[in-house]
Swiss-Prot record:
Gene Ontology cellular component list: plasma membrane
UniProt KW Transmembrane keyword: yes
Protein name per its UniProtKB record: Phosphatidylglycerol--prolipoprotein diacylglyceryl transferase
Enzyme Commission code: 2.5.1.145
Job description of the protein: Catalyzes the transfer of the diacylglyceryl group from phosphatidylglycerol to the sulfhydryl group of the N-terminal cysteine of a prolipoprotein, the first step in the formation of mature lipoproteins.
Keywords carried by this UniProt record: Cell inner membrane, Cell membrane, Membrane, Transferase, Transmembrane, Transmembrane helix
Biological classification of the source: Bacteria, Pseudomonadati, Pseudomonadota, Alphaproteobacteria, Rickettsiales
Record flagged with keyword Ion transport: no
Pathway the protein contributes to: Protein modification; lipoprotein biosynthesis (diacylglyceryl transfer)
Entry's localization field: Cell inner membrane
GO molecular function: phosphatidylglycerol-prolipoprotein diacylglyceryl transferase activity
Membrane topology: Multi-pass membrane protein
Major localization class: membrane
Organism: Ehrlichia canis (strain Jake)
GO biological process, one term: lipoprotein biosynthetic process
C-alpha cells in the first residue's frame, strides 16, 4: 500500500503525517490533562509553561534515544545528520525518558507532586502513541514480518511484494487505544489515583508487555537487527527495562501510601 507521507502542502512547505501525529498528541495531552486535572495537580500558572517543557523534552528525548539506541554508528560518522529531524528517527522509549526527566525537573521547580503528574500523563499519552503508530502505518515504515494471514499487507519500503503483518496497527490498538481505555477506566472508576504512581506503573507494564510481544511479528530495524540470541530486538530490551520501571513505580506508590496513612 502507498499513502502520501505528506498530509498537505503550503507552497514549498510540506506538512507530514508524522509531524502532525506529534502535534496532535501534544495538543490532546495538554487539553485532556487540564480537563481531568481541574487544577488539582497543576495550577493555572504552571499550565501556561508546561507545554514548552513537554515539546522540548519529547523531541530531545526521542531524538537522542534514537541516536543512542538504534543508529549510533551512523551518527558518529555523520554528526550533522543528528539535527535533521525532518529525515525521521525518533524513539518512543527515548521520548518517554526525556519527558519524565523534563517533568521531574519542572515539577520539582514548581512544587508539583511528580508521581501525580506522571499519573495524569499515563491517561493522556496513549492517544499520542496511537497517532504516532498510525503515522508509521501511513509512512509504510516499521512494518511486520512476512505472513499468510488475511490481514497481511504489502509495504513497498520492504523491497518485496510479500504480505506482511501491519504491526503498526497492532501497536496503535494495543499500546494506544487499549492502554487509553485501561488507564482512564482505572482513573475514573476506581480509587487507584489516590495511590500516586500506580497509574504510571500500569502504563509502563502494559506498554512494555504489549510492545515486547508485538516485536516478535515486527521486522527488526535493518541497521541493528537482533541484539540478543538472534531473537531479541532493541525495542524488546528497552521494553523489559520499561516493565522493570513499572514495578519500581509500584514500590514508590506503596512507600508514599505508607507515609500518608
Amino acid at each position: 500500500m502507498i499513502i502520501d507521507q505528506v498530509a498537505f502542502r503550503i507552497g514549498p512547505l510540506q506538512i507530514r503525517w508524522y509531524s502532525l501525529s506529534y502535534i496532535f498528541g501534544m495538543i490532546f495531552a495538554y487539553w485532556y490533562i487540564k480537563k481531568i486535572d481541574k487544577y488539582q495537580v497543576f495550577n493555572k500558572e504552571s499550565y501556561e509553561s508546561v507545554i514548552s517543557w513537554w515539546v522540548i523534552s519529547v523531541i530531545l528525548g526521542g531524538r537522542i534515544g534514537y541516536i543512542l539506541f538504534y543508529n549510533l554508528d551512523f551518527y558518529i560518522h555523520f554528526p550533522i545528520e543528528m539535527l535533521k529531524l525532518w529525515n525521521g528517527g525518533m524513539s518512543f522509549h527515548g521520548a518517554l525518558v526525556g519527558v519524565m526527566i523534563g517533568m521531574y525537573i519542572f515539577c520539582r521547580k514548581n512544587k508539583i507532586d511528580v508521581l501525580a503528574a506522571f499519573d495524569l500523563g499515563a491517561c493522556a499519552v496513549p492517544v499520542g502513541i496511537f497517532f504516532g503508530r498510525i503515522a508509521n502505518f501511513i509512512n509504510g515504515e516499521l512494518y511486520g514480518k512476512v505472513t499468510d494471514i488475511k490481514i497481511g499487507m504489502i509495504f513497498p519500503a520492504s523491497g518485496d511484494l510479500l504480505y506482511r503483518h501491519p504491526s503498526q496497527l497492532y501497536e496503535a490498538f494495543g499500546e494506544g487505544f487499549l492502554l487509553f481505555i485501561i488507564t482512564n477506566s482505572l482513573f475514573f472508576f476506581t480509587k487507584i489515583k489516590t495511590s500516586k504512581g500506580m497509574l504510571s506503573s500500569v502504563f509502563c507494564i502494559w506498554y512494555g508487555v504489549i510492545r515486547f510481544f508485538i516485536e516478535f511479528v515486527r521486522e527488526p530495524d535493518v541497521q541493528i537487527g537482533y541484539i540478543i540470541f538472534d531473537q531479541i530486538t532493541m525495542g524488546q530490551l528497552l521494553s523489559i527495562f520499561m516493565i522493570i520501571m513499572g514495578f519500581y513505580f509500584i514500590k514508590l506508590a506503596k512507600v508514599q501510601d505508607k507515609f500518608s496513612i
